[in-house]
Amino acid sequence: MENGEGTGPRLVVGAGYALYRGPLADSHTHRHAAFQVAFAPGAADPVPMVTATDGDGVRHRGAALVVAPMVRHRMEPVRELVTYFIDPHCAFADRLRAPGGPGITVAPQWRGLREEQVRPAGAQPSARVDPRLRAAMEAAGDDAVPLAGLAARVGLSPQRLRALAQEQLGLPLARWRIWRRLARAADALRAGSTPAEAALLGGFADQAHFGRRMREMTGLTPAAVLPALRPASGQARRAT
C-alpha cells in the first residue's frame, strides 16, 4: 500500500519526498538536507515510540518525531521504522516548519502519516521560500553548474543566494547538492547498478565516497538500504 503499510522493506520516491519503511538496526550520527518525519508502525495500544539523540546528547522520544534540516542526530534502533524525507522547498514542508522549529520535535499528530497526505503538497512549491531560491535548488542537481552559475540563472549574486538558503531553509546549497547526488545514486541502485556503478552515476568519486556521504547524511550505508531499493523485492518504486 502507498502509505507504507505491509511487510518488507520499501522505498518510495515522489515529487518533494521520499518514504522508507524497514528495520533500523542502528544508525550513525548524521544530518540531512530535508525534514524527517519518523514513527514506528503498529498497534495503537500501546503506541510504539521512536527515539532520537541530538548532537548535544539530548534524547527525544515520542510517538512521532520531526527532525529539521541539518540537525545532527542519531535514531535509536527499532524493529520497523516509517520515515519520510520532505524536501524543504515543497509546500508540505511548510506544515513542518512552523511548529517544529530548528531542532527535533515530538509530534504525535504525524504518527500514521500516509503517502496520499504528502503527495499533493509535496509536488507544490513552498509559499515561504523565495521563488529564486526554489529555482536554484531545482537547478542544483546539475553538478556542472557552479554556485555562481546558479546565482546568475536566478538573478542573484552568489552571496545573496547563499544567504537566502541559510535564512529560509537552514542549509547551504552545497549540502542540498550532495542530497540530490544521493538520490541519483539511489535511483541507480534501484535500477540494478552495483554500488560502485551507482556511486559514479550519482557523481561521487568512488564507492567509498558514496558510502561516507550516505552515512553522513542518512546514518545508513548503501548495504543497509539495498533490500528496500532492489526491484526484486517488489517494494521499491517511484510514485506516480
Summary of predicted features, one role per range:
Residues L164-L189, R213, M217-R230:
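Alpha-helical DNA-contacting segments of helix-turn-helix folds
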